[in-house]
Amino acid sequence: MNNIRKNHPLMKIMNNSFIDLPAPSNISSWWNFGSLLGACLALQIITGLFLAMHYTADTTTAFSSVAHICRDVNYGWIIRYLHANGASMFFLCLFIHIGRGLYYGSFTLTETWNIGIILLFTVMATAFMGYVLPWGQMSFWGATVITNLLSAIPYIGSNLVEWIWGGFSVDKATLTRFFAFHFILPFIIAALVLVHLLFLHETGSNNPLGTSSDSDKIPFHPYYTIKDLLGLLLLILLTMMLVLFSPDLLGDPDNYTPANPLSTPPHIKPEWYFLFAYAILRSIPNKLGGVLALILSILILAIIPILHTAKQRSMLFRPLSQCLFWTLTADLFILTWIGGQPVEYPFIAIGQAASILYFTLILILMPTVSLIENKMLKW
């Protein structure tokens, strides 16, 4: 058995990635979220596949096909809610995973970090298109508002929007292509995950100290397989509590009304995991400026390795940077709250202040404080 595991061409890859992989001996539970994201992706692909067997991508029957899944298909309700709430768990793990990378300086592994940013954009695109598929009010108007943002692009904007819509409004053609993309993208994500892991295993994992752990490595199995299993059980517990007790907690009641192009919902808003970016978009009165701010709010992650001015990799022993990190976290919570509020006083002002703080923290305050901490090392 030992020989098969180490010599068989396929088994050897698995062995070197998940069994005999040398891992740092001191990585904490914050490193669990990578494997949890893998579990979330597997859950989404499996539940999505079963939903696709019963779903029809047509404007006249899409809404009723989702209702049919919940009412008539064996365990259809649990498959649907696992898929919807599984997306929320996916993003929760994703945000913590990115936060961990920022806190402990994992962004210094630039190839892994950049593939991660591409993954984030791909997952966000997939989730957005998935939200359109039930063809409820928020699905339709969310699709209309977000795709319409592309019309802010000079010269080609309006043509681009009509090209994406496949007509002069969000209609049957849009729904069909969104379903096609929503089906294929998770498999592209799975391929990107393998590239992400490939680059990670080239350098080895970071650790809480941010130091080299080459002198002290332990095998991934059994130590971290058991540790990841505990994290997985807790994730399953949280997901099942959500699915079985309050499946619609994170959804929007408007999406239980079939899409109606003649009636606009009072407050158009995306799912909770996009609210922070939506708040940044809304905080700028100019359309093109808002779109640029929206894209930059995510793309800013790509320049974080360049903005890293500290002599220490991790924030573990940098209390001033820690204060700024948790301020950034609080700021993102505020932006998420603002994104779900109507566009009126005082929410507009709070959103603008939180948006300015978000960019100021990342671009100016964090690099400056890191330089101050470098000076403090000499005291």
From Swiss-Prot:
Record's GO cellular component terms: mitochondrial inner membrane; respiratory chain complex III
KW Zinc-finger (keyword) present: no
Membrane topology: Multi-pass membrane protein
CDD domains tied to this protein: cytochrome_b_C, Cytochrome_b_N
MF term (GO), any: ubiquinol-cytochrome-c reductase activity
Cellular compartments annotated: Mitochondrion inner membrane
Cofactor details (free text): Binds 2 heme b groups non-covalently.
Disulfide bonds: none
Residues that, per the record, bind a ubiquinone: 201
Transmembrane segments annotated in the record for this chain: 33-53, 77-98, 113-133, 178-198, 226-246, 288-308, 320-340, 347-367
Annotated residues for binding of heme b b566: 97, 196
Keywords linked to the UniProt accession: Electron transport, Heme, Iron, Membrane, Metal-binding, Mitochondrion, Mitochondrion inner membrane, Respiratory chain, Transmembrane, Transmembrane helix, Transport, Ubiquinone
GO biological-process terms attached to the record: mitochondrial electron transport, ubiquinol to cytochrome c
Extra facts: Heme 1 (or BL or b562) is low-potential and absorbs at about 562 nm, and heme 2 (or BH or b566) is high-potential and absorbs at about 566 nm.
Subunit: The cytochrome bc1 complex contains 11 subunits: 3 respiratory subunits (MT-CYB, CYC1 and UQCRFS1), 2 core proteins (UQCRC1 and UQCRC2) and 6 low-molecular weight proteins (UQCRH/QCR6, UQCRB/QCR7, UQCRQ/QCR8, UQCR10/QCR9, UQCR11/QCR10 and a cleavage product of UQCRFS1). This cytochrome bc1 complex then forms a dimer.
Family statement drawn from the similarity comment of this UniProt entry: Belongs to the cytochrome b family.
Function: Component of the ubiquinol-cytochrome c reductase complex (complex III or cytochrome b-c1 complex) that is part of the mitochondrial respiratory chain. The b-c1 complex mediates electron transfer from ubiquinol to cytochrome c. Contributes to the generation of a proton gradient across the mitochondrial membrane that is then used for ATP synthesis.
PANTHER family: CYTOCHROME B (PTHR19271:SF16)
Stated name of the protein: Cytochrome b
Source organism of the structure: Eulemur fulvus collaris
Gene: MT-CYB
